């Protein structure tokens, strides 16, 4: 029978803790970027064309803010997937402890 267990209990627990922290942090960053927080302006990839465009410069900056926010939400979803995988590994390790050899 093929075992789906590929990491030990410590690594699985570490992956679970790190993924929970990553989801919380990236979700908060995504919220702050989509609400156009001024303190995060240094993390927005602005160019000179964005600041001096003929259209409306604030709209191009807001578009970049939203794009970075969406990227944070996508990364948070990836962390949810890794957390689910780590949770499954923790459960498989617990089940392995109770099996009689």
From Swiss-Prot:
Superkingdom in the source lineage: Eukaryota
Molecular functions per Gene Ontology: RNA endonuclease activity
EC number: 3.1.-.-
Intracellular or extracellular location(s): Membrane
Principal EC category: hydrolase
Ribonucleoprotein recorded as keyword: no
Transmembrane annotation, as ranges: 13-33, 68-88
Membrane association type: Multi-pass membrane protein
Main location per the UniProt record: membrane
Homology family: Belongs to the RNase K family.
Job description of the protein: Endoribonuclease which preferentially cleaves ApU and ApG phosphodiester bonds.
Name the UniProt record assigns to this protein: Ribonuclease kappa-A
Organism in which the protein naturally occurs: Danio rerio
Lineage: Eukaryota, Metazoa, Chordata, Craniata, Vertebrata
Gene: rnaseka
């Amino acid at each position: 029978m093929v075992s789906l267990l590929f990491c030990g209990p410590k690594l699985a627990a570490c992956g679970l803790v790190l993924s929970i922290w990553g989801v919380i942090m990236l979700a908060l960053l995504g919220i702050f970027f989509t609400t156009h927080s001024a303190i995060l302006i240094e993390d927005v990839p602005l160019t000179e064309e964005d600041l001096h465009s003929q259209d409306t410069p604030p709209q191009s900056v807001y578009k970049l803010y939203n794009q970075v926010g969406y990227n944070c939400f996508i990364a948070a979803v990836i962390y949810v997937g890794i957390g689910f995988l780590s949770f499954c590994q923790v459960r498989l390790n617990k089940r392995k402890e109770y099996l009689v050899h």
